[in-house]
Amino acid sequence: MHYPEPISKLIDSFMKLPGIGPKTAIRLAFFVLTMKEDTVLEFAKSLVDVKRNIRYCTVCGHITDTDPCYICKDERRDRTTICVVQDPKDVIAMEKMKEYNGLYHVLHGAISPMEGIGPEDIKIAELLKRLQDEAVQEVILATNPNIEGEATAMYISRLLKPTGIKVTRIAHGLPVGGDLEYADEVTLSKALEGRREL
């Protein structure tokens, strides 16, 4: 189908976003045509503002508009504990729980030999430097419960063993409200391994 050039460019731009295929891109482009101009300009300004003003915290790697980020600046947080996550979205998920009060370290990925991503391609060296400079007593490995996340956690755990810092791994288990019969074997196994005394 042939579209006027501005619409074709907009469709192509939308298709660069993750999870947006041709049909959704076309639908979004035509929706933009129905929007008021000031709404479109505000949307475009928001995109530019995010790109210009959001960066990664030089301490932990989380997204921020100030450096260091609000978490690293907060003196009320437990500075003896660092939770290591793969992605800034993981920090946001952890913060929503309102149960963790320590600091974070964002790796920006996970070790994945199949994709050519090694330890040097993620922020492990920065983590090791932080651990030398700060009085950390515990590192919580909260990488994803998949092959890459587990490999990354094991790699970091082995690196930290000689330091004497306590290294823990978040337990992976059944979702609240989930039925045992619908859980896969790995989830059940991890739930059993991560059990705690009541």
Curated annotation (Swiss-Prot):
Record SMART domains: TOPRIM
In the UniProt record, does the keyword DNA damage occur? yes
Nucleotide-binding as a keyword?
no
The alphabetical list of record keywords is: DNA damage, DNA recombination, DNA repair, Metal-binding, Zinc, Zinc-finger
- Give any GO molecular function from the UniProt entry: DNA binding
- Outline the residue ranges of the record's C4-type zinc fingers: 57-72
Residues covered by the Toprim domain: 80-175
Fetch the InterPro entries from UniProt. DNA_Rcmb_RecR, Rcmb_RecR, Rcmb_RecR_Znf, TOPRIM_dom, TOPRIM_RecR
Q: Which GO annotations describe the biological process of this protein?
A: DNA recombination; DNA repair
Name the family the entry cites: Belongs to the RecR family.
Q: What does this protein do?
A: May play a role in DNA repair. It seems to be involved in an RecBC-independent recombinational process of DNA repair. It may act with RecF and RecO.
- The protein depicted here goes by the name Recombination protein RecR
Species of provenance: Geobacillus sp. (strain WCH70)
